[in-house]
């Protein structure tokens, strides 16, 4: 596939030249690769995008981020197994790409098709608790924008804080509370590059309303309405699970599910003008009382992910198909 540049990639309107020169990226300790502890350069991300596009047949239309246990097991029924004509590339083989270190996160990009529609899936995301700054956790989102996606589907494993939620439920995310942002930890912190998006992007409509309506209709078609919810998600830094006091505070401010990802990815995606749909698989009941028996653990998260693989595979497949249909009718 021919290399891309800032003038012809995707929607040209989203890649206007920056109004003024940005500060140079400090390459000290970076071997001159344009990515350091201080951030990234647009040109370096473009190089990553071209590296990937030179190895695939089709530009993907939709990007998918697979949550814990939902894309990491390449076997029948898994979310990632939905992709046909798959081309897999390890993060370790992609120049300047981070590497996932968490069990249940396989660590590769998978290019291929779902229902004949070109997609790219992340089998393994990057977390703040792994030692990565948030901008680097979200680097793949910017790269996916550059390789052509218009829509990002984000999945995560989350604790159910809403007392009506049960383990195994699927929560459509309608909004989030950026708890990490309250302390100034934001993926957009630092110099802004207007070739990606504006300095102050709005977040009041971060999760596409039409996609959420489609998802509810699909749940009805699949006869899984009884396990599909809609609510508010929040992300904490981890890696420890939350205290009883922390969970009760979150419950008071309207949080329905809590995890360690997604929010910063969605902020970055919206900054890049990507449409977003997100869902949480409720993998454990949050411990909101000192008298409750049991504690959250990562093995439980993976077990529930495996349990719901078939449901998620069908759900996401139909969602990809419907999203593509409605987006094709957009002017």
Task: Give the ranges of each region predicted by the language model.
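Metabolite-binding pocket within alpha/beta catalytic cores that recognizes anionic/polar moieties
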Residues: 2-203
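Generic non-transmembrane alpha-helical segments
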Residues: 51, 55, 210, 214-225, ...
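Short acidic/polar active-site loop segments enriched in Thr and Asp
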Residues: 150-151, 256, 275
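Active-site rim beta-loop-alpha module in soluble metabolic enzymes
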Residues: 202-249
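Zn-dependent metallopeptidase/amidohydrolase metal-coordination segment
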Residues: 260-300
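His/Asp/Glu-rich mid-to-C-terminal helical/loop segments that flank catalytic regions of hydrolases
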Residues: 287-331
């Amino acid at each position: 596939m021919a290399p891309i540049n800032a003038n012809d990639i995707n929607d040209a309107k989203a890649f206007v030249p920056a109004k003024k020169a940005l500060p140079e990226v400090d390459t000290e300790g970076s071997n001159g690769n344009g990515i350091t502890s201080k951030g990234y350069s647009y040109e370096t991300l473009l190089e990553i995008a071209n590296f990937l596009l030179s190895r695939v047949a089709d530009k993907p239309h939709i990007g998918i981020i697979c949550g814990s246990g939902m894309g990491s097991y390449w076997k029948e029924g898994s979310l990632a197994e939905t992709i046909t004509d798959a081309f897999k590339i390890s993060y370790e083989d992609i120049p300047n790409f981070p590497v996932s270190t968490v069990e249940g996160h396989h660590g590769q990009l998978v290019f291929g098709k779902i229902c004949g529609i070109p997609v790219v899936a992340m089998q393994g995301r990057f977390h703040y608790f792994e030692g990565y700054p948030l901008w680097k956790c979200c680097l793949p989102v910017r790269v996916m924008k550059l390789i052509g996606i218009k829509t990002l589907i984000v999945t995560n494993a989350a604790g159910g804080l809403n007392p009506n939620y049960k383990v195994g439920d699927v929560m459509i995310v309608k909004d989030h509370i950026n708890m990490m942002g309250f302390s100034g930890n934001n993926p957009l912190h630092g110099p802004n590059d207007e070739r990606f998006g504006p300095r102050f992007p709005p977040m009041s409509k971060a999760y596409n309303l039409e996609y959420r309506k489609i998802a509810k209709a699909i749940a009805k078609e699949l006869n899984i309405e009884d396990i599909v919810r809609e609510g508010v998600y929040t992300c904490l830094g981890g890696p420890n699970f939350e205290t009883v006091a922390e969970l009760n505070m979150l419950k008071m401010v309207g949080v329905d599910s809590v995890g360690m990802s997604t929010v910063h990815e969605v902020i970055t995606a919206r900054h890049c003008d990507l449409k977003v749909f997100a869902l949480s698989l409720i993998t454990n009941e949050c411990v909101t009382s000192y008298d409750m028996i049991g504690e959250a653990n990562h093995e439980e998260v993976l077990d529930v992910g495996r349990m719901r693989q078939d449901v998620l595979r069908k759900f996401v497949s139909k969602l990809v198909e419907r999203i593509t249909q409605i987006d094709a009718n957009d002017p």
